[in-house]
Swiss-Prot record:
Its EC number is 2.1.1.222, 2.1.1.64. It catalyses: a 3-demethylubiquinol + S-adenosyl-L-methionine = a ubiquinol + S-adenosyl-L-homocysteine + H(+); a 3-(all-trans-polyprenyl)benzene-1,2-diol + S-adenosyl-L-methionine = a 2-methoxy-6-(all-trans-polyprenyl)phenol + S-adenosyl-L-homocysteine + H(+). This is Ubiquinone biosynthesis O-methyltransferase. GO terms for biological process: methylation. The keyword Methyltransferase applies. Keywords: Methyltransferase, S-adenosyl-L-methionine, Transferase, Ubiquinone biosynthesis. S-adenosyl-L-methionine binds at R44, G64, D85, M129. InterPro entries: SAM-dependent_MTases_sf (IPR029063), UbiG_MeTrfase (IPR010233). The gene is ubiG. Pathway: Cofactor biosynthesis; ubiquinone biosynthesis. It holds the Pfam family Methyltransf_23. Belongs to the methyltransferase superfamily. UbiG/COQ3 family.
């Protein structure tokens, strides 16, 4: 990988990339390490599609697309989708799965900052799901997403709140007790408080439209969207 050749792609954590490269071959295993992403994807997709007024015919960018779970599902909704990621192996998995599924997605290995330098104002919808907590400078990602979306377009972020409850739920619970995700997936110090994310949004052309929590019930083994942003949350913003 050549992730340090230009100033635009400095915003890369190679240790984070290595975590996902190591398990990339199992990205589409519904019972594997990415089972939670498969489980929550219908909720994410539904929220994005509803808040954006549908995806059919729209040009969509998925930032930090990984193996393509969300990107493929948005393409199935009729969107023209580009997926960005700095992980070579996850992108190879995404490309192969799209080919096998007969789904057209344009997968590109570059940072969102690099992409923004070439494609500013070209997307109707930009999604950045579970990615901000894996880069050194998440505010830079927020700025780039704002640059990439058209006037009036929608940008969606999802990440984890930083507090004791999120540490218990997302790290201790999900990684060590329930073993829903591999140990070491999350670093609570990199979690982002909603006020911090909204502060970064306020410094761009984006405006907050809606925020919701994503909740897991271990008793029913189910996920749902609803009030409360103590752990996982999703933010809908719109370009002014």
């Amino acid at each position: 990988m050549n992730a340090e050749k230009s100033p635009e792609n400095h915003n890369v954590d190679h240790e984070e990339i290595a975590k996902f490269e190591a398990v990339a071959s199992r990205w589409w295993d519904l019972e594997g390490e990415f089972k939670p992403l498969h489980r929550i994807n219908p909720l994410r997709l539904g929220y994005i599609a509803e808040r954006a007024g549908g995806l059919f015919g729209k040009k969509v960018l998925d930032v930090g697309c990984g193996g393509g779970i969300l990107a493929e599902s948005m393409a199935r909704e009729g969107a023209t989708v580009t997926g960005l990621d700095m992980g070579f192996e996850p992108l190879q998995v995404a490309k192969l799965h799209a080919l096998e599924s007969g789904i057209q997605v344009d997968y590109v290995q570059e940072t969102v900052e690099e992409h923004a330098a070439k494609h500013a104002g070209q997307y109707d919808v930009v999604t950045c799901m579970e990615m901000l907590e894996h880069v050194p400078d998440p505010q830079s990602v927020v700025r780039a997403c704002a640059q990439l979306v058209k006037p009036g377009g929608d940008v969606f972020f999802s990440t984890l709140n930083r507090n004791g409850k999120s540490w218990l739920m997302a790290v201790v619970g999900a990684e060590y007790i329930l073993r829903m995700v591999p140990k070491g997936t999350h670093d609570v110090k990199k979690f982002i408080k909603p006020a911090e994310l909204l502060g970064w949004v306020d410094q761009t052309s984006l405006k907050e439209r809606h925020i919701t929590g994503l909740h897991y019930n271990p008793i029913t083994n189910s996920f749902k969207l609803g009030p409360g942003v103590d752990v996982n949350y999703m933010l809908h913003t719109q370009n002014k």
